[in-house]
Amino acid sequence: MSTRKSPFFKKAEISLASPKAIEIWTERYFPNGQPINEVTSSETVNYKTLKPEPHGLFCQTIFGPVVDFTCACGKKATKLVKNKKFRGYCPKCGVERTSSRVRRYRLGLIKLKQPVAHSLYVSHRPSPLRLCLGWSTKRLQAVLKAVEFCYLPLIFTTFQSERECFSFFPKSFLLLRSQLTQKNEVFLEPRSSGFNENLSSSFFFKEKKRSKRKTGKVFPLRTSPRLFHKKHQKNRPRLVFNHGVIEARLYGIAYDATWPKVEEFQEFLFYLWEQSFFYESSIPYYAFAKGVKSYKEEIPKREQSYALQTGGLALQQILSHHDSSRFEYDLIYLSKKVSMILEILKENMASLNLDYEDDQKEYKKLLSKVKKLDLLLLKWKRQRELYRDFEVGKTQPAWMILNNLPVLPPGLRPITSIGGLVVASDINSFYRKIIIRNKRMSPRNNLGIFDTTLGGSWLSWCYNLRQVQEAVDELLRTGSVDAGRPLKSLLDGLKGKKGRFRQHLLGKRVDYSGRSVIVVGPKLKLHQCGLPKEMAVELFQPFIIQQLRLQGIVFTVTAAKVLIADRKPIVWSVLGEILKRHPVLLNRAPTLHRLGIQAFLPRLVEGKAILLHPLVCPAFNADFDGDQMAVHVPLSAKTRAEALSLLWSRNQLLAPSSGQPQHLPTQDMVLGFYYLTCSLEKTLKRVDSLVSSRKLFFQSSFFLKKKNEETLKNSIPQNLYFSEFSQVKTAYDIGNLTLHTPIWVKWTSCVQTFVPERHSRLKETLLETRLTFSGQRQTLFIDTCQFFSPSFFFGKKVRFIRTTPGRIFMHWCFFEANAEMSSTPTSKEKKSLEKK
């Protein structure tokens, strides 16, 4: 018995697809070799019978049968076909007898009569198309929408300088007469101009040796250059001067120059074709032309009779001659040059004296130049990264232009009838629009450049091209509105919470996991989370059963499950011991970075919500307005150790992207700290007024009355004097104090006083020293009071500080959190507070 192994994928890559690769995805053939992948009809199904129309968007011949092993004629695969050539295919309708599941992954193909640009590479910022061409966004959109056109030659050429052409060094080579007909392929320079082969000059050189003779003058040709090549055109004789050296009169037309109207280009050519004379100065930019290497192996060949091009075809012709590695090298060289210039400019700026008006003007000029060069360096950096991506991914820039449009399988864009109404996917409407508009594209008439009817036919043809480009944009990215209802594009169906990825492919259910709403848990520690009891029992049920059996409480799994179902108290105690050493993983979708999933030690809480510390919310990008989080339980000891070492929340203090602190107090925390520590007292301007605002101890009835030591211990101080923090907490819980009430508290350690700014130079400002009738010495400072026994120098020193209950509570939270503060007052304390 053989077992079938599932395919194993090491990695998956997303990159540009070549036109040839798109054809390979969709190519299928009849046994006689006829292709069956092209969708030529815009029809979908018959709305009466709901049967797919032939050659349409739901064609059974292209995408497979609707019913398993049944062709469009209704014949099943049990009836054998006598003709072995059509074994597996119906000889009448041509439908393959196979499973209907193939309709979920078989692709179709729409062959576009004119290439169109992929809208995602145009709309994205920065646009890869714009970076490759070096055009502005406005200009790129104008060419794509067929509002402007370019002059593109039938054969791209690049030019050498006169220095390279007329070099006399022995290593230099010159083009021989016999080599003129041979293909000499080089790469297109980043800023080289494109010329027609009949416009380009032809030079015939003989091999030269070192000699003292100089070249004479170069005379122009007496023939006019021609823009369009015709087969019946005869080659006119050419004049040869100066020992076989010849040079044609030539004005270059850049390949990236655009014209909005045909009439403007005709006017330009009218002056370009004007006869030139030998005494006019020649343009030193050109010498002789060479062929340019093209990356068109995987691009379908198209007949090009016009040098005027617009839309995707113009961009494809330009991009097909781009050499990514050469461009990247040139940009690196230019960036180094500009960096050196920037250093010189910055040195000049530093040497200027800004006290003088002339230097200020010069500084502004240099600053504007520096900003422009910085922007230029940024642009070149993006271009280098783009060309490097093309080179690493083994792709070509010309593949951003679509020659063939793949059609999604019918299973992903269904059409059905519900209650007598036909319901179809929005994608079908876009495909129908593309097919209809693509049929309108007709080949251009072979008109002369100065033909009077060229302008009108050109505008009509450009309008049809623009319609096809807009239809493809609606399918891929923008969508449209039909009868007041928005139609979703392919991008809309993929992105967002309701898209294909997040709604259907992601969010799978996993064992030992749960999901619930998160609420704030301010009493939790940073590494803790609150886990509902009911959820914890279900998640940790195997661990509870194991502990119950190990401790001898039960002996079978069934008995343990009964004990857990009854929610016995022993279950909660066992679960609490397990949770002390067993972390859980909390995850909030979407997990965009590694901090989106962290480990916590759970604590059992009542309710059905997960408690989360507020400081860990920024890492999850979570808030408490209904967000949900998933809980995952690491099962093995190895995974638990890995979770505590790598994912524990107390170790994720710094953001991995920037290194900045991740757990920062939020605005409500800062506001809470301020509210907790502020006082009701207003800022006093004079120090003398501070004495009257503080009651001294001899004014208090608490110190004037003689009481025994037990009464002093068990009674609450009157007139806002306290000897312990617990007494402050008790008075606050009863309601005798507020957070901002000024009080005096006994304190033996150091204290930070709130001294006004004008007294900050002094350590403490002494307000008054008093001596009572009983011999007790009292010293009053701004925020502290000191009392000494009658023995003066050898007596015990007692210090009281002036503070508020809010500051005491904050001190307890920071420094004495482990000490248990009494939450309920005793009966004697309640009586003494009620008397006040």
Curated annotation (Swiss-Prot):
Localization per record: Plastid, Chloroplast
GO biological process: DNA-templated transcription
Keywords on record: Chloroplast, DNA-directed RNA polymerase, Magnesium, Metal-binding, Nucleotidyltransferase, Plastid, Transcription, Transferase, Zinc
Alphabetized InterPro entries for the sequence: DNA-dir_RpoC_beta_prime (IPR045867), RNA_pol_asu (IPR000722), RNA_pol_N (IPR006592), RNA_pol_Rpb1_1 (IPR007080), RNA_pol_Rpb1_3_sf (IPR042102), RNA_pol_Rpb1_clamp_domain (IPR044893)
The protein's Enzyme Commission number: 2.7.7.6
Residues at which Zn(2+) binds: C71, C73, C90, C93
Note on how the cofactor is bound: Binds 1 Mg(2+) ion per subunit.
GO cellular component: chloroplast; DNA-directed RNA polymerase complex; mitochondrion
SMART domains from the UniProt entry: RPOLA_N
Cofactor dependence: Mg(2+); Zn(2+)
One function term, GO molecular function aspect: DNA binding
Binding site for Mg(2+): D623, D625, D627
Enzyme class: transferase
Function: DNA-dependent RNA polymerase catalyzes the transcription of DNA into RNA using the four ribonucleoside triphosphates as substrates.
Name listed for the protein in its UniProt record: DNA-directed RNA polymerase subunit beta'
Organism this protein belongs to: Chlorella vulgaris
